[in-house]
């Protein structure tokens, strides 16, 4: 079809459609408003301001009389202290694109929309601007079936590109003109949609747009609408073979018409490349992008766009317009009628992925036009579901229709107890993470679950019928549900209620099974609050399989057999599971058979929160020498050999094991080592076993982020058994802006001095210690935060001991990659406190030293390493040089101490993958430890008992984090702690030895502030 003929037919359609729409009668239960816009704007590309006129004809097809109109003035959100700005700065997890950027906009960078004049049917009308909402008090109310003409003159300034709308993006695009004009608010059976703009979702009214845009002639425009004057414009829009006749002057006026759309968006740039493609028997595709080395994928995007439109037109329904434009814009990806804006510096997979997602919105949003502010899951979610299906088709990948990624994303949110119901207004979610899940994720999950509940064929028919029946009609969730019920023959109110109105978890369990003389008994339990039908695959000892299907009673029906999922496996349908019954008993008579394996939901289409109880025998995945990432479908265990050597402890041979379920739940760390003892003095009696076992379990009944850890450790002749309860305070636990951690630890410590290596013998008492440790930390105490510890203990069941410490640090970002940390710590303990708890400010306590895996792994190789190489265990206090031997250090271990530190850290090579792990340091510290009944028993400071003070420089390198070790670091505590440092204190107060310069060069291992 020629472009001329297409334009003629579109004009006929436009006139005919407008006539039919304007002639519709008011129907009490099935109506929608309609508008026509006639706008003329003139954009000054030097000032980034434009003047505009707008004639709006508003048709009231509702049964209500309207005495007010409401407009959105979106640009007003881009001003300091606007609601969008305040919300972005106060929310728990700000959108990184916004953050506090609006707050720092200058007068030339803000956005605004000023109404210069407004008339109702030619008469001045009273109006009021409330930030992003314009309230109009009509002179004459609009009766049902009536209309009003509003004439507006307005002035706008385009804000610096921050979110969706704006100018001069990070990729250099001049104008992304979205939410750019005074837009009439939506009105439906729920009333006016007048939420102030904070950067989230929208609700629009279908209408016809006639838009003229005048700007510098060097610019090219792309967007919504059909260009009416292509031969005056050219720039790739011209009709081939016809002469381009541009008007005189340095400006061009672009004239667009767009029938039956809910919005109008456009971009303008002076360096656009414009490529045009044609979908066979479909729309024309326009690609407008800034060509360059980082935009090469756009050359291939056109073919993918054509194929995507063809695929979706068949899968969902015909593409509803004659044009689709992919525009290189300023912010991520955003959908508008006939067009999408995407950032352009992407690889092909990313570019195709975002194009597909935004293209799908043409079906699920700009055509259906649900109220995104209330039902974002119906648009973003359905789009997300279809995106993976479409990209799999485009790239020839075999992929499941089940949105596993959405399942795992939402399960993570449930695990962190941050989920909010999907029926929450888009602006009212407490976190951006919950909003993202409630819009993008939940709708995708709805589709995945519907495919499981009623079958994939019925779901596909539902999608097609939903689009066909409800396009251009603003459907709501009930209308989608009714389509699904009609196509499936099932009752689904129960499903939509729990999926949309609650955050209930799905958790079904195989409790037990038994086989006796061919009689099979299986007990299933519903441990979660949410309901689901059950697919249960039974595998028998003779190699045969049987699918047991149990519908939910509330469905009042069953799904058809699914040969596309289960092949020829025979299906047995049992009586429905009543929602009032938490347990379901299965009894089958299968002569000569016994059960070898049972799997609940073998197709992985049910978003079960705990699949460890979905398979019997227990689903265990054993891997060799691999990091444990956590799996949804099984408990992962990784094992590897462990070998080491120490001069005093001898050879170590053993096994290291790690285990975890999804999200690091049910964490297991275990290591067992046979030690030979000193090889030079080897005796069979010296052979011993060291071990380190810990298991962490989430305590669901204690709220968010509560865990219990049980641990038993023994190495180098010292052991500890403990039970630790950790609870993060606050609604969001570990996700709080400033975390608050409360810990309670019961422990037993003991020592066998005959197995201690020499350096530990002097720092650890022989007697056993039973104790209780209580800790409370706010923030990250080693960076910015405070921590206090209270410890009570009983040594050898006789003397009582106790201690209290307080530590605080505050870190400032002085410049890029340069920080300054101010720290202080103070502690006091009873005079009877064990030796391993006593403080010397030049280094860690004996207990801390024993816990320093990296330090002992290195120093135990040879007993001379600490003295010959000046190797010490870091404690982050800045007084490390005083811990060296033979320097005459005045530091003593006491039951009281204080330290103060200033630590400057610079990472000059942050852009390099390896060198970014290096930091240069400048530090100063002072401190003192002493013995006394009370902390106030501070000793007299003199030459023989000086105050310790040090100033120096250093360099650190996080050796365990180099990329080559990324596979091994999660498996090794040694690598996790392996931070090496070289520190050179050039001033140290009060040294009393003959080798004070030896203290000026210290190699440190690990860092524990």
Enumerate the language-model features and the residues they cover:
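A surface-exposed beta-strand-loop module
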Residues: 59, 96-172, 247-248, 576-593
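Outer-membrane beta-barrel initiation region
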Residues: 544, 584-590, 601-701, 727-731, ...
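C-terminal outer-membrane beta-barrel translocator/porin domains of Gram-negative envelope proteins
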Residues: 643, 707-713, 722-726, 741-745, ...
């Amino acid at each position: 079809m020629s472009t001329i003929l297409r334009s003629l037919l579109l004009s006929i359609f436009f006139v005919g459609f407008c006539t039919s729409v304007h002639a519709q009668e008011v129907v009490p239960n099935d109506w929608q408003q309609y508008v026509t816009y006639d706008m003329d704007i003139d954009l000054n590309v030097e000032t980034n301001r434009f003047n505009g006129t707008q004639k709006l004809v508003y048709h009231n097809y509702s049964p209500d009389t309207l005495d007010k109109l409401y407009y959105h003035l979106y640009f007003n959100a881009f001003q300091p202290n606007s609601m969008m700005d305040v919300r972005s700065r106060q929310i728990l997890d700000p959108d990184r694109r916004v953050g506090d950027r609006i707050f720092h906009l200058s007068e030339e960078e803000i956005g605004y929309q000023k109404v210069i004049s407004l008339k109702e049917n030619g008469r001045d009308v009273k109006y009021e601007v409330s930030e992003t909402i314009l309230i109009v008090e009509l002179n004459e109310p609009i009766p049902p079936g009536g209309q009003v003409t509003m004439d507006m003159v307005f002035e706008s300034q385009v804000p610096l590109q921050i979110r969706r709308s704006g100018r001069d993006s990070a990729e250099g695009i001049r104008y992304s003109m979205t939410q750019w004009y005074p837009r009439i608010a939506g009105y439906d059976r729920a009333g006016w949609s007048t939420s102030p703009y904070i950067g989230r979702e929208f609700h629009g009214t279908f209408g016809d747009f006639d838009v003229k845009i005048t700007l510098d002639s060097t610019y090219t425009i792309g967007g919504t609408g059909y260009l009416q004057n292509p031969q005056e414009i050219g720039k790739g829009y011209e009709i081939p073979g016809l002469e381009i006749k541009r008007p005189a002057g340095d400006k061009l006026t672009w004239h667009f018409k767009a029938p039956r759309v809910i919005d109008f968006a456009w971009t303008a740039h002076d360096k656009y490349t414009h490529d045009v493609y044609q979908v066979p028997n479909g729309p024309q595709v326009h690609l407008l992008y800034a060509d360059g080395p980082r935009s090469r994928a756009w050359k291939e995007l056109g073919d993918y766009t054509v194929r995507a439109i063809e695929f979706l037109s068949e899968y969902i329904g015909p593409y509803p317009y004659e044009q689709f434009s992919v525009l290189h814009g300023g912010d991520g990806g955003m959908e508008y009628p006939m067009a999408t804006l995407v950032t352009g510096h992407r690889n092909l997979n990313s570019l195709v992925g975002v194009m597909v997602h935004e293209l799908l919105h043409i079906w699920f949003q700009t055509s259906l036009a649900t109220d995104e502010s209330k039902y974002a899951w119906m648009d973003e979610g359905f789009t997300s579901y279809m995106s993976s299906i479409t990209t799999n088709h485009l790239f020839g990948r075999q992929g499941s229709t089940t949105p596993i990624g959405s399942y795992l994303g939402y399960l993570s949110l449930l695990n962190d107890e941050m989920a909010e119901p999907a029926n929450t207004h888009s602006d009212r979610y407490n976190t951006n993470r919950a909003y993202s899940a409630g819009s993008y994720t939940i709708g995708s999950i709805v589709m995945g679950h519907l495919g499981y509940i009623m079958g994939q064929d019925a779901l596909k028919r539902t999608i097609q019928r939903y689009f066909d029946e409800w396009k251009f009609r603003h459907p709501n969730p009930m209308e989608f549900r009714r389509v699904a019920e009609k196509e499936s023959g099932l009752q689904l109110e129960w499903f939509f209620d729990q999926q949309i109105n609650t955050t209930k978890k799905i958790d079904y369990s195989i409790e037990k099974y038994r086989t006796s003389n061919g009689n099979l008994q299986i007990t299933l339990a519903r441990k979660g609050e949410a309901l689901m039908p059950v697919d249960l695959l039974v595998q028998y000892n003779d190699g045969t399989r049987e699918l047991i299907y149990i519908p939910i009673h509330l469905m009042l029906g069953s799904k058809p057999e699914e040969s596309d999922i289960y092949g020829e496996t025979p299906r047995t349908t049992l009586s429905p599971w009543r929602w009032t019954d938490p347990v379901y008993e299965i009894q089958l008579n299968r002569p000569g058979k016994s059960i070898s394996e049972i799997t609940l939901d073998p197709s992985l289409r049910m978003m079960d929160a705990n699949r460890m109880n979905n398979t019997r025998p227990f689903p265990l995945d054993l891997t060799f020498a691999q990091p444990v990432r956590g799996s949804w479908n099984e408990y992962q265990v990784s094992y590897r050999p462990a070998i080491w050597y120490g001069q005093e402890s001898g050879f170590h041979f053993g096994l290291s094991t790690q285990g975890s379920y999804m999200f690091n739940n049910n964490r297991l760390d275990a290591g067992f080592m046979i030690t030979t003892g000193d090889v030079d003095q080897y005796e069979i009696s010296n052979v011993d076993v060291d071990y380190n076992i810990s298991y962490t379990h989430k305590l669901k009944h204690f709220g968010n982020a509560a865990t219990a850890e049980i641990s038993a450790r023994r190495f180098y002749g010292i052991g500890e058994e403990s039970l630790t309860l950790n609870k993060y305070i606050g609604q969001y636990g570990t996700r709080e802006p400033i975390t608050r951690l409360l810990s309670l630890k019961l422990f037993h410590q003991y020592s066998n001095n005959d197995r201690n290596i020499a350096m530990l013998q002097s720092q650890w008492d022989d007697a056993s210690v039973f104790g209780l440790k209580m800790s409370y930390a706010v923030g990250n105490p080693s960076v910015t935060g405070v921590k206090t510890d209270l410890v009570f203990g009983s040594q050898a069941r006789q003397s009582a001991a106790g201690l209290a410490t307080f530590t605080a640090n505050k870190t400032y970002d002085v410049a890029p990659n340069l920080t300054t940390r101010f720290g202080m710590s103070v502690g006091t303990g009873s005079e009877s406190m064990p030796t391993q708890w006593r403080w010397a400010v030049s280094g860690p306590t004996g207990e801390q030293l024993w816990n320093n895996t990296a330090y002992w792994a290195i120093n135990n190789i040879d007993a001379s390493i600490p003295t010959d190489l000046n190797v010490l265990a870091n404690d982050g206090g800045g007084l490390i040089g005083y811990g060296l031997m033979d320097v005459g250090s005045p530091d003593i271990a006491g039951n009281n101490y204080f330290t103060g530190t200033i630590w400057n850290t610079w990472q000059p090579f942050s852009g390099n993958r390896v060198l970014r792990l290096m930091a240069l340091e400048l530090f100063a510290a002072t401190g003192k430890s002493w013995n006394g009944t009370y902390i106030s028993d501070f000793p007299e400071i003199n030459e023989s008992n000086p105050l310790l003070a040090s100033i120096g420089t250093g360099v650190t390198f996080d050796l365990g984090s180099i990329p080559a070790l990324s596979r091994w670091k999660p498996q090794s505590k040694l690598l996790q702690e392996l931070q090496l440092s070289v520190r050179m204190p050039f001033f140290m107060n009060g040294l009393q030895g003959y080798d004070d310069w030896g203290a000026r060069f210290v190699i440190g291992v690990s860092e524990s502030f």
